């Protein structure tokens, strides 16, 4: 099974979008928009569909970049995390999967965080990539 998550970064503020989950798995934890890739769907197609479902739209973006691919030990599950740079923060129109949202500075992690995202943000390689992305797209 494949799934995808997208970390929106506002070029104007340098902050990232998080969603507060309201679902059965890990309710009350903070995560990213995204979900399961349907049969016959591409990663990008699934990402766009999930964002439309969870945010009300897939916002216009400056750049879309793969950040990480996690594969479970048994090879059955893949989770693809992307960074999507948008010009400005936006107000998502949340569906019933989420209770709220927050735009936060990198390193200001919402708590409790979804365990998969927590594992990702604690990787030094991810911290380095995020810092590089922020530096590349930071407005003066």
What residue spans do the PLM features occupy?
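Conserved N-terminal beta-strand and adjoining loop/helix that marks the start
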Residues: 1-17
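A short gly/proline-enriched turn/hairpin at secondary-structure junctions
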Residues: 31-32
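Charge-rich, solvent-exposed alpha-helical interaction surfaces
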Residues: 129-132, 136
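C-terminal lobe/hinge of AMP-binding adenylation domains
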Residues: 20-21
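Unchanged
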Residues: 35-122, 137
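A conserved beta-turn-beta hairpin within the catalytic core of GNAT-like acetyltransferases
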Residues: 25-28
């Amino acid at each position: 099974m494949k799934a995808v998550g997208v970390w929106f970064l506002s070029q104007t503020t340098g902050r990232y979008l998080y969603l507060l989950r309201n679902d059965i798995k890990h309710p009350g934890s903070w995560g990213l928009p995204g979900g399961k890739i349907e049969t016959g769907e591409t990663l990008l197609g699934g990402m766009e569909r999930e964002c439309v479902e969870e945010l009300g739209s897939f916002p216009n973006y400056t750049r879309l970049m793969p950040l990480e691919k996690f594969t479970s030990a048994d090879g059955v599950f893949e989770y693809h995390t992307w960074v999507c740079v948008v010009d400005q923060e936006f107000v998502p129109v949340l569906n019933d999967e989420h209770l709220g949202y927050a735009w936060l500075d990198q390193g200001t992690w919402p708590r409790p965080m979804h365990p998969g995202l927590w594992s990702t943000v604690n990787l030094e390689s991810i911290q380095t990539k995020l810092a590089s992305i922020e530096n590349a797209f930071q407005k003066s």
